[in-house]
Amino acid sequence: MKINFQNMYSLRKISCGLIFSMAISLVACGSDNDEEGGGNGDDGLVEDTSIPGNSIVTVKQNRNIILHNPLSGWVLYAGIGDGLSSTFWQDYDNFPSSEGTVKVSDYANTLYLRGAWADFNPEEGKYAWNSDCDTPSAKRLKMLIEGAKQRNMKLAFTFVVDSRDKHYNFTPNFVKEAGAKGYETQTGSVKVWSPYPDDPIFQKYYEKFIRALAKDFNDPDKVQFVSGSGFGKWGEYHSVWYYQVRELGKPELPTREAVFDWVTDLYSQVFDKVPVFVNYHRWIGTSKEWDGNNYDKDTERLIGKAVAKGYSLRHDAFGMKTYYSTWERNFIAKWKYLVPVVMEGGWVKNSHGNSIQGDGYANYAEVRQGEFDEAKTACVNMMDLRYNSDFRNGETYSWFNEAFQLVKQFCTEGSYRLFPDRISLPTTISNGKQIEIAHRWNNFGWGYCPTNIPQWKNKYKVAFALLDTKNDKPKYVFVDGEPEACDWVKGTAKSYTFTTRVEGVGAGKYMWAVGIVDTAKQNEIGIHLAVKNNVTSAGWLKLFEVTAR
């Protein structure tokens, strides 16, 4: 397969697509309600009067197809502690819903593993994902990873170090034994220990763990994202206690900022290929648990520092009106289409029960609707299906039985849904000659495709391929380096003109095709388009036949 990169061979005509748009305005195009990906093919060709030798093909979006694309869709939760069901995959492959039994991985394409650092790192230098570790937690982890692989799901991680509200130590005991400073708290009848995150011994061992993790999991083929902190209560970066503050009485901000800088530097440096996320809420990194509508004046600045390092944003209490309110809404609105957002609901059916009534919810169907509405307003890319060992009382069961229509609605309206509605291509090509391709792109999802984050820099690009007419495999690929999918947002189409030279193409007939390729994987399709008909098994959208001379 020959590859022609725009920055090597092509000449760019920077255009807002005015001529192209005028030419194709005479061609019927799909409306927002189009269901099928048809309309592309030889029968739908119209001569392009603005580009001699070109024909225009129109493409209709498909609103029903569920796309499993990077940083998009539903996230299925799991852990590797004792609470994990031994029939996890069997349960979720045969999951009851309001419309019958479903397979959850048909809807979710990410398995999110949130758990105790101690479970992932039981002894110094020993890690649960390696073959030399055979603890019960390690066996569960390997089972989950293998099951995710079989279902074409990627992984995501959060590692919690704080043991408050837990029934065992979430930080490995060898860290305490090495002399790390910490504090004890009581959970029921159990006394647990948590480290101070400003302690240098803690930081030494934590950094060693994260670097070991990145060595095996800084891989976008395996991992969807990593939460780059995990401090404070529940790993959500609030209610954080510091040694310098709590024991020595020093001001909080200098220590808090130093720890924040250290941990965000660490994750952003070692995970340079996988997106990393930080929580957004009004008390980031403070010792405060909450304080009504008040907020910390340094929080927004600190989160901005993390984003500048390449962090994206998540929040873990969507739908809880105390913890996701005016400050959070206003904050995330400033980052709309600048960084991707991941949501997690806050209400837990099994433990919160009727407390939801304080937020004005009559039942958990209304809770799910409240979470969904907030997620849509925040333009999130990913939503949560949380785990409970008693899954019939869990959030995933609630979504699939009390709000299944919202599960499906997010699949077809949320995240990003990209497709080119109109493309002008030459009907014949000749070696040594320039060709001109005009193309227009849309996004009908409420989120965006974050090709602007540093982990994805120059990774996903629009490409046009000449397919072998016998087997649909690409013989020649022309990569247009100009378009950025992050610019495509709902309600605004983007038009481009791509001029390139044809070199080394064998004479004969080919099929024009278009796709968004992963340049790090020899231009395999990296992002699937929101179309259905005329798509090859590899994900290329076939357009029409072309003759090479």
Give residue spans per PLM region:
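Aromatic-lined substrate-binding rim segments of carbohydrate-active enzymes
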Residues: 100-185, 256-275
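Aromatic- and acidic-residue-enriched segments that line the glycan-binding/catalytic groove
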Residues: 164-188, 238-250, 292-299
